[in-house]
């Protein structure tokens, strides 16, 4: 296919238009008075959301060059979401601010490479400043405040704080639909491990890219499965029962995996395969944990067992299993309660006896998975559209809370980013030329989130930013109540990890955009260039 090329100013300005179109859509959602965005769906009712990454992923622009700019900003949002689980709108606002100001300077003749160095130095200094002002999460109230701000809902904050209290800060929390209109938290015994599905064709929910199995059998083995004949009798028994199957194995290779995938696609049976968690002796121990939890048996050479001889009685089972590309969560296993309690006691004894800190940590992880259970947040709403929107908010709040537990929290509402600006003065003083310009660009961009929060509240952003700079550190603008106050004392806080990731990812992609000198895109095909359908020949003998 023929390509279309743009260079220098033409290339950058086309991409900037795409950046602006996406960012202008996303930034309307930031802050307590941010608005929602309605997304058209190819089927079903439209989605109403204020989730930055969901909006960014749904935007596809007609102009190829503009679309590339938009997709780079979308990548910033996605990367921030992957790392911190929240802060995608902040990342988008920061990216637009850095790119817009940077483009002006590059157009005026500044060297983009020098500007890039300045952006990188300023970002590193700002991140250090954020870490220094960070507070540790100590109480249930801290967790509730962080979740409340992320979801813009105090009830959600309380729910998540309750869930984390029940299963611990490192516990597993999942989100499900409720049958009613109320949202509640239930704790169900369960286990999660960091292995996902072997093939994306095994997913059952294409929106979330996850596989959900209801009341499945669980085959647990430390063997490699390369020949489908080894498990064929077992598969036939499972099909006759009409139930789904989760296979946990050392690996599935050869023709076995494609055969499973093909039968899954055809609808012959519902199967998901995952690799066994851990390595060596720890793998064997974790497989035993899963077997005890599900009431199954580990099919292992150590026990002199062969896969082809395995029966359906040796399979475990569970009420529900959820598998993503990175993790598997088994909820409400069918294992014997006494056997589970006995296994928990064994692990507790091992923790007491071990002298290795590493071994102790791994044993405590196993104990939490076996005894801690899984907290299930059941989300209720009056309509399907409201349910989707509510789930997005709860997912963001949950991710933000986990991020805060890891790295602490800073004053919210964009206050921390403005407070960290003086930390860049020392770096700026030692820089010259275009590098100093890059640092100034970041200093200006750090004001952008507060500015946008104020504008979404119907105020003049510059006035709020200037007043904020006069206040002592930690005092910020509370857009919900339209007043300046101590943000931490008011419970308006952001996870340090979220704020840090948003800034780092925004700076990284912005620097790449500014140093772009040429853009190559597919040339649009003219409408009349579509190939004509061939006319059938050899029909002359027909009457």
Swiss-Prot record:
GO terms for cellular component: cytoplasm. It catalyses: ATP + H2O + a folded polypeptide = ADP + phosphate + an unfolded polypeptide. Its EC number is 5.6.1.7. It is found in: Cytoplasm. It comes from the Bacteria. Its main location: cytoplasm. PROSITE patterns: CHAPERONINS_CPN60. GO terms for molecular function: ATP binding; ATP-dependent protein folding chaperone; isomerase activity; unfolded protein binding. Keywords: ATP-binding, Chaperone, Cytoplasm, Isomerase, Nucleotide-binding. GO terms for biological process: protein refolding. ATP binds at residues 29-32, 86-90, 413, 478-480, 494. NCBIfam families: GroEL, PRK00013.1, PRK12849.1, PRK12850.1, PRK12851.1. Forms a cylinder of 14 subunits composed of two heptameric rings stacked back-to-back. Interacts with the co-chaperonin GroES. Together with its co-chaperonin GroES, plays an essential role in assisting protein folding. The GroEL-GroES system forms a nano-cage that allows encapsulation of the non-native substrate proteins and provides a physical environment optimized to promote and accelerate protein folding. Belongs to the chaperonin (HSP60) family. This is Chaperonin GroEL. The lineage of its organism: Bacteria, Bacillati, Bacillota, Bacilli, Lactobacillales. The gene is groEL.
């Amino acid at each position: 296919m023929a390509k279309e090329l743009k260079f220098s100013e033409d290339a950058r300005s086309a991409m900037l238009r795409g950046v602006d179109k996406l960012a202008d859509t996303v930034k309307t959602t930031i802050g307590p008075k941010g608005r929602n965005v309605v997304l058209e769906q190819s089927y079903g009712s439209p989605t109403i959301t204020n989730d930055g990454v969901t909006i960014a992923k749904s935007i596809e622009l007609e102009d190829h060059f503009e679309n590339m700019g938009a997709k780079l900003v979308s990548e910033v949002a996605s990367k921030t979401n992957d790392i911190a689980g929240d802060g995608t709108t902040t990342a988008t606002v920061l990216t637009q601010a850095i790119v817009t100001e940077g483009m002006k300077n590059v157009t005026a003749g500044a060297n983009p490479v020098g500007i890039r160095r300045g952006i990188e130095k300023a970002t590193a200094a700002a991140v250090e400043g954020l870490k220094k002002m960070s507070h540790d999460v100590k109480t249930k109230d801290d967790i509730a405040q962080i979740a409340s701000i992320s979801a813009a809902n105090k009830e959600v904050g309380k729910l998540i704080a309750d869930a984390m209290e029940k299963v611990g800060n490192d516990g597993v929390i999942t989100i499900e639909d409720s049958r009613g209109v109320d949202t509640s938290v239930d704790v169900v015994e369960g286990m999660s491990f960091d292995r996902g599905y072997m093939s994306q064709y095994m997913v059952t929910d294409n929106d979330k890219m996850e596989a959900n199995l209801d009341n499945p059998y669980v085959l647990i083995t430390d063997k490699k499965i390369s020949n489908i004949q080894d498990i064929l009798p077992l598969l036939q028994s499972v099909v006759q029962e009409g139930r789904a199957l989760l296979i946990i194995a050392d690996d599935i290779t050869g023709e076995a995996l494609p055969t499973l995938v093909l039968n899954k696609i055809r609808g012959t049976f519902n199967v998901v395969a995952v690799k066994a968690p851990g390595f060596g002796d720890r793998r064997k121990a974790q497989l035993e944990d899963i077997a005890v939890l599900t009431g199954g048996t580990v099919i292992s050479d150590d026990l002199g067992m062969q896969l082809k001889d395995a029966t359906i009685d040796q399979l475990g089972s569970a009420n529900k299993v959820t598998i993503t590309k990175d993790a598997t969560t088994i909820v409400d296993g069918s294992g014997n309660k006494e056997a589970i309690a006995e296994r928990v006691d064994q692990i507790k004894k091992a923790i007491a006896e071990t002298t290795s800190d590493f071994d102790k940590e791994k044993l405590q992880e196993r104990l939490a998975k076996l005894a801690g259970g899984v907290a299930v947040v059941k989300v209720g709403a009056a309509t399907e559209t409201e349910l989707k929107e509510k789930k997005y908010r709860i997912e963001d709040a949950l991710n933000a809370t986990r991020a805060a537990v890891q790295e602490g929290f800073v004053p919210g509402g964009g206050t921390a980013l403005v407070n960290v600006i003086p930390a860049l003065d020392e770096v700026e003083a030692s820089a010259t030329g275009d590098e100093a310009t890059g640092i100034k660009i970041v200093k200006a961009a750090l004001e952008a989130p507060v500015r946008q929060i104020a504008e979404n509240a119907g105020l003049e952003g510059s006035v709020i930013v200037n007043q904020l700079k006069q206040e002592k550190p930690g005092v910020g603008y509370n857009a919900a109540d339209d007043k300046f106050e101590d943000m931490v004392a008011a419970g308006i806080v952001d996870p340090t990890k979220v704020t840090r990731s948003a800034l780092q990812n925004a700076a990284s992609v912005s620097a790449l955009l500014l140093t772009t000198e040429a853009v190559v895109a597919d040339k649009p095909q003219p409408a009349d260039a579509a190939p004509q359908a061939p006319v059938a020949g050899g029909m002359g003998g027909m009457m």
